[in-house]
Amino acid sequence: MSTLSTKEPLAAIVGPTATGKSTIALKVAARLGAEIISVDSAQVYRGMDIGTAKLLPEERVGPDGRPIPHHLIDIVDPDEPFSVADYQKLARQTITAIIRRGHLPLLVGGTGLYYQAVVDPYRFTPEGGDPRVRQELEELAAKFGDAYLHEQLKRVDPEAAKRIHPHDRRRLVRALEVFKTTGQPISAALAWRRQQESPYHLAAVALSMPRPLLYRRIEARVDAMIAAGLIEEVSRLLARYDYRLPALQALGYKEIGAYLRKEIELEEAIAILKRNTRRLAKRQLTWFRRDRRLHWWEVDPDKIEEISAAIADFISRTIDINVE
């Protein structure tokens, strides 16, 4: 592969859950000689397979049966700390390695923060943070609840408070930690990032789908996960790990975990999981709609071949790829 740009080429297929990103990405990767880099904050964890819709190794193949390399899947255990800064570092190293092999790196997934940490010049400061400040904030959250941290963040960084969910403890702690250790709001770093140019020659696609169809697919996906053994998967994880770990608060694992602890009935857990997945899809759409560099494709499940070919052609023309 060669490109006319002096920047490293990078392609991406992002969008809400259940829009068919994995299926389309395999076809696009096969056409372009690409290697896929997962952009999913839950697929990094080993043992979390069904609930994250992780493709099995034998499913990571193109239409001709040839393997499509996948990266940043199954890289840490659920009890290992892993941050967006860790992801950024590994993803950028992987991008460079793929290009050196003469292939195109293709980001695929729906975790908006991970995606933007790679394609934009995100700065993570202070490096490593301050464990004492972090511990203090964790203790405040345990004593007064996540909503208390969110109120504190509103006072010092209202822009960040708008972006961070009131119950996303990890990100609330991080935002307050940055303010307490630097005196600067974390939103200032985001504003700086928005003013800078991407370090990559980017061809980025986002997938969408009519909402009624998307919601039907979400319902069917959750039912399929239950049938495939999600309850057993969560049970195995809870036998080894503390359910309060950030990894096990991921979508699917939190709801089924509550059922296994007998806090709710299975029927209620499934209904909550479907509702939370719909809410996730809405948040993902909102996040990606803010990025004007994304070129949107509405997915018709009956026209996957045509859509995949069109996306591959768009990427090829945008980056001026010559596949060798």
From Swiss-Prot:
It comes from the Bacteria. The record marks T111, R134 as: Interaction with substrate tRNA. The keyword Manganese does not apply. Substrate binds at T17, A18, T19, G20, K21, S22. Its cofactor is Mg(2+). Residues 40-43 are annotated as: Interaction with substrate tRNA. This is tRNA dimethylallyltransferase. It comes from Moorella thermoacetica (strain ATCC 39073 / JCM 9320).
